[in-house]
């Protein structure tokens, strides 16, 4: 990988270091924090370089963490370098079109897959919308398991299952790499000496006993072709997701293997957001 990638530190990846189990609400924003959050939400301060600095400032004016709600779901913000946290805290429309696309036409029994789930930006609203269905959250960083499970519990969601694993076209092990010191930008480097398990998506879906998938979101920093294509090309018709949100490497370009698979299986490009492409299977 390029020099901008480095190995994760123990602090960035060890889920056992998640020791704060205080009750959700103990870190609710104070008056000054709420004022600054409101200003950011209404201005350019919620974007770009401003958002990280404003998040740090807001957290410094309180207890160092924040308990907030986004789309009716509960999240604890820790203030580490995580662009997902910035968006959840400061932008009420964060990834709105992406989430709305996945949810369109779904019902209370719909099943969802969130590959590269981080702390649950997608997983929690999807699970909340389909309380009778299953939402399977997958992330290679063990630290995200503890964070997401805390957020799901605080949200009162019992239909979220967290799978702590990388996903690829074969079983193995990997090391985690991070870019821009941001725990939302993490990729795997396959290695026989790695301590992160790699599983196939087919194995995970089988283990979770899914019989249908309504929506799938995937954002795993360039590993999309190897993780998603083998599953799609071998899945039964019932298991092919009706809607897919996938990170695009460039504004008007998608991963070549996925593009071929989508075309072969009848998916059509429905739209794009700043970071993702939307595919629909009519």
Task: Describe these PLM feature segments.
Residues 2-141, 146-151, 155, 206-208, ...:
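S-adenosyl-L-methionine
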Residues 60-62, 170, 190-192, 263, ...:
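Residues that act as N-cap/strand-start positions at coil-to-secondary-structure junctions
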Residues 66-67, 193, 236:
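Short secondary-structure boundary/capping segments
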Residues 71-99, 158, 163-211:
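Glycine-rich adenosyl-binding loop in Rossmann-like folds that engage adenosine-containing cofactors
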Residues 117-119, 142, 169, 220-224, ...:
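Short, glycine/acidic-enriched loop or turn micro-motifs at the edges of active sites
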Residues 126, 148, 176, 227-231:
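Hydrophobic packing residues within well-ordered alpha-helices of enzyme cores
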């Amino acid at each position: 990988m390029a020099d901008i990638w480095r190995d994760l530190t123990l602090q960035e990846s060890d889920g056992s270091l998640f020791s704060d189990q205080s009750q959700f609400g103990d870190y609710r924003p104070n008056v000054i924090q709420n004022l600054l959050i409101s200003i950011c939400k209404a201005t350019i301060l919620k974007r770009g370089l401003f958002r990280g600095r404003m998040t740090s400032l807001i957290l410094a004016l309180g207890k160092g963490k924040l308990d907030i709600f986004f789309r009716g779901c509960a999240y604890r913000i820790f203030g580490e370098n995580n662009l997902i946290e910035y968006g959840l805290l400061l932008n009420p429309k964060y990834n709105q079109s992406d989430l709305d696309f996945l949810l369109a036409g779904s019902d209370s029994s719909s099943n969802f897959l969130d590959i590269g789930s981080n702390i649950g930006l997608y997983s929690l609203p999807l699970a909340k919308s389909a309380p009778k269905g299953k939402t399977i959250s997958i992330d290679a960083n063990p630290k995200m398991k503890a964070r997401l499970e805390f957020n799901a519990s605080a949200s009162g969601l019992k239909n979220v299952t967290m799978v702590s694993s990388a996903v690829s076209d074969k079983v193995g092990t990997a090391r985690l790499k991070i870019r821009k010191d941001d725990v939302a930008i993490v990729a795997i480097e396959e290695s026989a000496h790695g301590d992160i398990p790699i599983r196939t998506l087919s194995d995970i879906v089988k283990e979770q006993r899914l019989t249908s998938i309504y929506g799938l979101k995937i954002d795993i920093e360039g590993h999309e072709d190897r993780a998603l294509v083998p599953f799609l090309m071998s899945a039964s018709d019932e298991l092919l997701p009706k809607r897919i949100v996938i990170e695009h490497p460039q504004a008007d370009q998608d991963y070549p293997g996925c593009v071929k698979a989508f075309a072969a299986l009848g998916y059509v490009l429905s739209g794009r957001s700043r970071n993702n492409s939307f595919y629909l299977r009519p």
